């Protein structure tokens, strides 16, 4: 009986604490938000687009994701058309799938042509930027020259990567090596928000491939040049990493965010703010020795 008398008082105390916490930081999401899609966790500040209040409010798009069943594969998590594979709060990153560009010979037309959805992307107006540390522009082929550049012609960024095979001899290729023989890869600058891929035409009938790919997830195989194994292995798409941050439109920093305590999102007592490596915005993380969600009250735990 003593427990029953105490329960209302405990509930009132917890509710009061939550109200006080909400008054000094960003509002916590409702407790009935969908936090899983297709077996993938959806941690706040991200949420499903049709559930109001379940994601952080930001003037740029990105925290609202979609949980859809496309092609009868069961529900998957998407940002627009990109299938999301993982969301990292600690590193301020998201992994998703992106198209691989295939450049193959068309016997009817008698020329090389791109025969798959291009490996292009435009993240303008979103919280995301292409990771310059996690991704590499990767090109596969013999007698292949592929380019990557921005789509807005503002930063005038262009890079080229070439792959060749001596006399077209695939037996000379080395599995695991991507140093220009059958495979080439190069870095991209930090903070890119868009890119496109194109090929230079050569007299060849082998398919060539190019994509911006998560470097740690790719290992070259000679079979990628003698067959469609590369495209088949990834279903026409390969993992890509994007950085994300809060307040990128306003160019906010941790200092400016702390100056507005009523909307400061790092609400866990054991959280800290980190200025984003993409140059604008910030994200929250748990202090060393703690794990969890820094965007939730008491979300960081030992």
Protein language model annotation of sequence segments:
Residues 2-302:
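Typically disulfide-stabilized, N-glycosylated extracellular/lumenal ectodomains of secreted
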């Amino acid at each position: 009986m003593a427990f029953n008398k105490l329960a209302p008082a405990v509930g009132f105390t917890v509710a009061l604490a939550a109200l006080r916490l909400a008054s000094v930081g960003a509002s916590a999401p409702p407790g009935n938000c969908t936090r899983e899609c297709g077996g993938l966790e959806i941690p706040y500040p991200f949420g499903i687009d049709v559930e109001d209040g379940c994601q952080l409010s930001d003037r740029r798009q990105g925290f609202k994701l979609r949980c859809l069943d496309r092609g009868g594969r069961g529900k998957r998590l998407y940002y627009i058309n990109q299938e999301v594979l993982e969301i990292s709060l600690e590193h301020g990153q998201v992994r998703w799938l992106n198209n691989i560009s295939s450049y193959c010979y068309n016997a009817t037309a008698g020329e090389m042509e791109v025969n798959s959805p291009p490996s292009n992307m435009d993240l303008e107006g979103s919280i995301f930027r292409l990771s310059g540390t996690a991704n590499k522009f990767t090109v596969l082929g013999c007698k292949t020259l592929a380019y990557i550049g921005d789509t807005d012609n503002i930063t005038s960024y262009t890079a080229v990567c070439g792959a060749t095979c001596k006399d077209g001899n695939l037996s000379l290729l080395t599995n695991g090596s991507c140093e220009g023989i059958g495979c080439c890869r190069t870095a991209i600058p930090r903070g890119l928000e868009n890119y496109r891929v194109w090929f230079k035409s050569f007299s060849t009938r082998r398919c060539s491939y190019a994509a911006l790919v998560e470097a740690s997830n790719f290992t070259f195989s000679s079979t990628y040049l003698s067959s469609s194994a590369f495209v088949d292995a990834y279903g026409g798409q390969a993992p890509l990493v994007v950085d994300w941050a809060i307040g990128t439109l306003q160019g906010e920093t941790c200092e400016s965010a702390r100056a507005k305590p009523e909307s400061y999102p790092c609400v866990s007592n054991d959280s800290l703010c980190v200025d984003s490596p993409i140059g604008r915005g910030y994200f929250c993380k748990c202090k060393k020795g703690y794990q969890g969600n820094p965007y939730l009250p008491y979300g960081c735990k030992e």
